[in-house]
Each structure stands twice: as structure tokens, then as C-alpha cells.
């Protein structure tokens, strides 16, 4: 993320105000709630920090490609060690952070049409994206598929019709990436014309929910959703982000 963007996001500015990369929808119709749920289904249950950085990075698809190539050329580097190794790269901070998670980066690189849509949606419809994330999390919770585990801590904010689901790593220094089949984890899918996207991570089961190894990547996490101030707001730890670049 560019330095100016970091400073603005640190005071909870909407993503639209600081991350317009010039390709958002280009005058076409906005994505519908059904389309957003479809494209966000594979990642809505990621920890908040990782999810926000994936969506930021999706706005830089060419850099995603370059970072994925670097990751494939350096297969022994993962977690914070990988992030430290790309400090000198000119990529956005969010893209650099994803080299900590090779499978996540590979998924974004292998399905660039999906990645482009994620980036477009985050740039031009950030509130709708946040609403979709919470809608999907509520579905998973209703199926008893979103709960606190040794890998993650799940809490809620708000009450009544305004409950927000917060997902954090159980250990802030060790990040686990869930792999799951959206058709299973969310229960009956309400939009037959828009089945959920499913790009399983390496090693994931064809159905159900799977935890792989945790990554020592606490230093790579610099953002989170500020659900309490409106779903579309993302908080950035400026010092943490600058440590990735410098």
C-alpha cells in the first residue's frame, strides 16, 4: 500500500477514498449482493487481517503475478521470513504481505479474473463487500461452522439485526488459513444462478473444513476491519505496515 494510503487508512478512511487504482468497474453495473456473495465465499472466513489485505492486494493484479512468481522461485521462504525477503520490491505493501502465504497468493495468481473482480468490488463497493462478508459469516455461524478453535478466535459485536462477526488468530503471531468448501460450510446456497466460487487451497479436502499448518506471520499483518465504525472501514497499523517496506 502506498505511503499516503497508509496514513489515511490509519484514521479509518473508507477504502474507496484511498485506493482507486483506476480500473473499478469502468462504468459497468455494480456487482449485485448475489455476485458478491459468490465471489467472496472462498475467503469470507479468513481472519480479518488477512482478509482485508487479500482484498487490498486484489487491486494490484499485475503485482500479484510478480509476487506469485517470486514465491514459486523461493519455495522455502514462508511467513515473516518471506515478507522480509521482499522488502526491496516495488509492490504494494498488501501484496508483499501475501508472500507469507504461498497458497493464498497462488490462488489469486491462478484465477486472475476472480482476483480482478475482488479488487474492483473492494475499490468501488467497499460497504457492499463488507456486508457480504458479514452475510456469509452469519450463514456459516448458523451451520455451526464459524466458532472459536485452537487456530482462531471468533467474537461478535453489536446485537439484534446488527451483529458483526470478528475473526482473529488465536495466537497473533501464528496465522492459520482456513480451507473449506463453500457449498458445505455455508449450508443451503440461496442463489442457484450464482453458485459460490470454490478454488481449494493445496491440500484442502474436497468437502468440509480444513486447517493446514500455521504460518509465523504476525509481522505481516498490518490491518483489520473496524466493524464497530461501519463495515467498510479498515484500520491500518502504520508502523507495522512501514516495517514491511523498510
What are the language-model segments listed below?
Residues 19-26:
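Boundary at the C-terminal end of the N-terminal hydrophobic targeting segment
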Residues 16-19, 155:
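N-terminal non-cleavable signal-anchor helices
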Residues 3-7:
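N-terminal export leaders
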